Each structure stands twice: as structure tokens, then as C-alpha cells.
Amino acid sequence: SPEDLLRLEDRYADRLVAPAIAAGTAAIVAHRARAWIDLNRAEDDLDPEMVSPRMDGFKASNSLKMRGGLGLIPRRLLHAGDLWKRPLSSEDIKHRLEQFHRPYHLAIERSLLNIRNRFGTALLVDVHSMPPLTATAMPAPRIVIGDRFGQSAPSLYAEMLIERARSLNVAAALNHPYPGDYILRRHGNAQGNIHAIQIEVDRSLYLDSMLREPGPG
């Protein structure tokens, strides 16, 4: 249903970075819903059950996300079941890769290289939204910073962001439950002075009570 698909959207997340864009920061905004193709998954994170007939020479990654139904093309959602009535054709998959997935990552690569070459270092901030989390013993984080446990960026970046969130009385966490995925793995390159971090923002911080439209936050 449309309500279920909303859970797969980083709804209005581009508005979170509008001030940075206005200040001159380079930004690349995805305009395809995650249900269509997940840009935060590798090409081999494709569930073989999603394609008919099978793609020649294709070997799936067997990643945990893919096996859980949230691969390159999400197949199912918890409490919602299957998202597609039938498997997709191999031509459809290739079209989505060639027209959306590959150009998106190529644009990121080019932008990071240009910035690194100009300033000596570059930082990718990968902005997403998340559903409100639940917690028991302590307040649930409303912002989660991911650096793949220090693999995609020096810890200084994450520490600065968490400190900033807490200074605004917003509960923040590091790498739990979202450490970052393919975008950070692909584009973070510490040896090349290109660093990458992920920011997950609780949708209730900036959307209305129905989590559909921009709110007062």
C-alpha cells in the first residue's frame, strides 16, 4: 500500500540540507524512491527471486539485508509482505542500474574527487531519514551518526556531530542501529583523503504527526 511505501522513503530529507546548499555546499539529491532502486545497496545485493529469467552470470551477494528482503530492489517489508506482484525482467533491472544507480554513484565520485583535489580532503555526508526508534532504559536516539565503526571516517567527525546534537538537546547515537552501508563503503577512502559519514534523522523531528508533510521542526 502507499502507506507501506512511505516507510521506504527518505521523505523530504533534501530539506534538511537546504541551508548547506544555500551556503554553497555541493549536494546530490536522489529523486527515485528506495522502493524503485536502493542507491545504498551494491549491485550484487539483488535478490535472485526478484528477476525472471535469471540474469546470466549474476551472483548475488547473499548479504543480510538482501536476505531480509531489503536488497537493491526491496522485495518485502516487515508487517507489509511482498512489495511486487511479480518478478522484474532482467532488462528492467539493467535499466534501473544504468539510468539511476550507476550515474548517481559516478556523480558522487566526481564531486568528491573535485573537492579533494581543490581542498586536499573531502567529506561525504550521506543524509537519510529514519522512523522513530523505541528505547527502554534511556531516551531513544533521534539522530544516528554512522561511520562504519570508524572505517569510513576519522572518529572526530562523528564525535563533533554527536556533540552538536546533544548541545541542542537531541538524543544522538553512534553506529547503532545504523552504521552506514554501501554508500559509505564505496565512497569512503581514508587513504585518498576522502571521508564519509551517514546521518539518520528521526522523521518526527521535521515532519508532521502523520510523518507525511513538513512539520514545525
Residue spans for each PLM region:
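N-terminal catalytic or cofactor-binding beta/alpha core of small enzyme domains
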Residues: 1-124, 129-217
